[in-house]
Amino acid sequence: EIIILPELFLGISLVYLVLHSTFLAVRKNYPLIQSSILYLGVLVLFLSCLLVLNDGLDVLEQSVLNDTIVNDYVSFFSKLVIGSLSLFCLLMIQPYLINQKINQFEYILLILFAVLGLFLLCSSNDLLTAYLAIELQSLAFYVLASFKRNSTYSVDAGIKYFILGAFSSSLFLFGSSLLYGVTGTINFEEFKDLYVNVSPGNNADLSNISLVQFGLVFILIS
C-alpha cells in the first residue's frame, strides 16, 4: 500500500488540469474552460477522498520517506474532513463565481492546490515537510484572497494575509532552526519525547518549542 497515494493522485491530477486548461484556453472561451475545470476538479477531489477511505485504515501508523510522512488516525480523519468540506465547497461555488463575474479557471486550480497542501500538512511528520506543506497552501490562499483585482477589499486582504503569513513563517523557521541546533532532529516523534522529558530548568528548549508553537498558532489565526 502507498501511504501518500491520495496526495500523489491529487498532485498528478493537478498537473493534468493545468496542462488541460492551458491548451484548451487557446481554442475556447474562459467560462467554458471554467465549467470543464470545475467538473474535473470535483471528480478529482471525490476520487482523492475515496483513496483516503480505501487506503487510510489499511496503512495506519506507517511512515514513508524516512519518517517524513506518516499515516495515523489524526491525519486520516483530518484529510477526510478537509476533502469532504472542499468537495462540498466546489459543488456550491459555481453560483458564487457567476455572481462575482469570476471567469478565470485558475480559481478552481488554486483551491485544489490548497487542498493538496493541507493533505501534506496532515501527513507531515517533521518540521521541514510541515513548513513546505504550509507554504504550498498559503501561496494558494494568498492568491485566492486577492483574486478580485478590481476590489479594494480583496487586494487589501491579500496584502495583509501575505504580511501576516511572512511574519508567522519567519517565527516558525526561527524556532525550527533553534530546535534543530539544540536537539539535532526535526522529527515530531522525537520532539514529543523531548517535550515530555525536558527539565524544568532548561529554558532554551522550552523557548524554542514555544516559538514553533507560536508560529503555528499565528499561521492558523491569520
PLM region descriptions:
Residues E1-S222:
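Alpha-helical transmembrane segments of multi-pass membrane proteins predominantly involved
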